[in-house]
Amino acid sequence: MILVDTSVWIEHLRAADARLVELLGDDEAGCHPLVIEELALGSIKQRDVVLDLLANLYQFPVVTHDEVLRLVGRRRLWGRGLGAVDANLLGSVALVGGARLWTRDKRLKAACAESGVALAEEVS
């Protein structure tokens, strides 16, 4: 299962991403409540339809506040320009066996690599 980050969804909503379409068709794309919240704060066409579709994808688990703080401390994630949502996504992917994170955020990619969280490969 691949957790699709907000950065990928934003680009997909502007111009369809063929790889994401394929992952969706194969039920391999998952979402996270915080990604849905981030997208809900933006201007998106067919807002209700899109948010409903996202909510019906596989939902990655929400980690607790204490779990996020432990992750930040153990992996030394402070001072890297990551946000709270980024840390939550890292923790969430780490909880799901075999899961990967697909992001276009450079700082989040670097944190994944350093934390041992698998990244989904970009396909050009």
UniProtKB/Swiss-Prot annotation:
GO terms for molecular function: magnesium ion binding; RNA nuclease activity. It comes from the Bacteria. Residues 2-112 form the PINc domain. The keyword Kinase does not apply. Signal peptide: none annotated. InterPro entries: PIN-like_dom_sf, PIN_dom, VapC_family. It is an enzyme of class 3 (hydrolase). It holds the Pfam family PIN. The keyword Nuclease applies. Keywords: Hydrolase, Magnesium, Metal-binding, Nuclease, Toxin-antitoxin system. Mg(2+) binds at residues 5, 86. Its EC number is 3.1.-.-. GO terms for biological process: negative regulation of growth. Its cofactor is Mg(2+). HAMAP family: VapC_Nob1. Belongs to the PINc/VapC protein family. Toxic component of a type II toxin-antitoxin (TA) system. An RNase. Upon expression in M.smegmatis inhibits colony formation. Its toxic effect is neutralized by coexpression with cognate antitoxin VapB32. This is Ribonuclease VapC32. It comes from Mycobacterium tuberculosis (strain ATCC 25618 / H37Rv). The lineage of its organism: Bacteria, Bacillati, Actinomycetota, Actinomycetes, Mycobacteriales.
